[in-house]
Amino acid sequence: MKVLILIIASVLLIGVECKDGYPMNSEGCKISCVIGNTFCDTECKMLKASSGYCWTLGLACYCEGLPENVEVWDSATNKCGGK
């Protein structure tokens, strides 16, 4: 019983840090998509995300549950198109 409590306490204290966002290609642009989630889900899972889908309004892949070390697109630090 003590071991179970120790494991639960450890998980709660350590926590699993995850983030959501738009993954970027090598040029710093969002990964484009048009319809369907299969492509984006595959791209996101290659980055160790829990899932991904095509956000149709933005025509870009959106990943959920990305590790903290994966860079995601941010309008403040946008480098896409030489900006």
UniProtKB/Swiss-Prot annotation:
What is the tissue localization of expression for this protein?
Answer: Expressed by the venom gland.
Q: Gene3D superfamilies under this entry?
A: Knottin, scorpion toxin-like (3.30.30.10)
Disulphide bonds annotated for this chain are 29-80, 33-54, 40-61, 44-63
* Keywords (A to Z) from UniProt: Amidation, Disulfide bond, Ion channel impairing toxin, Neurotoxin, Secreted, Signal, Toxin, Voltage-gated sodium channel impairing toxin
User: CDD domains given for it?
Assistant: neurotoxins_LC_scorpion
Name the predominant localization: secreted
Which InterPro entries does its entry note? LCN-type_CS_alpha_beta_dom, Scorpion_toxin-like, Scorpion_toxin-like_sf, Scorpion_toxinL, Scorpion_toxinL/defensin
Question: What is the residue range of the signal peptide feature?
Answer: 1-18
Pfam families for this protein: Toxin_3
Propeptide residue span(s): 82
- Molecular functions per Gene Ontology: sodium channel inhibitor activity; toxin activity
Q: Which SUPFAM superfamilies match?
A: Scorpion toxin-like
Q: What positions are modified (Glycine amide)? A: 81
Q: Which GO terms describe its biological process?
A: defense response
Q: Name one GO cellular component term.
A: extracellular region
Name where it's found: Secreted
Q: Where is the LCN-type CS-alpha/beta domain?
A: 19-81
Instruction: Tell me the domain comment.
Output: Has the structural arrangement of an alpha-helix connected to antiparallel beta-sheets by disulfide bonds (CS-alpha/beta).
The family note in this entry says: Belongs to the long (4 C-C) scorpion toxin superfamily. Sodium channel inhibitor family. Beta subfamily.
State the protein's purpose.
Beta toxins bind voltage-independently at site-4 of sodium channels (Nav) and shift the voltage of activation toward more negative potentials thereby affecting sodium channel activation and promoting spontaneous and repetitive firing. Is possibly toxic to mice, freshwater shrimp and crickets.
Q: Would you tell me the protein name for this molecule?
A: Beta-toxin Ct7
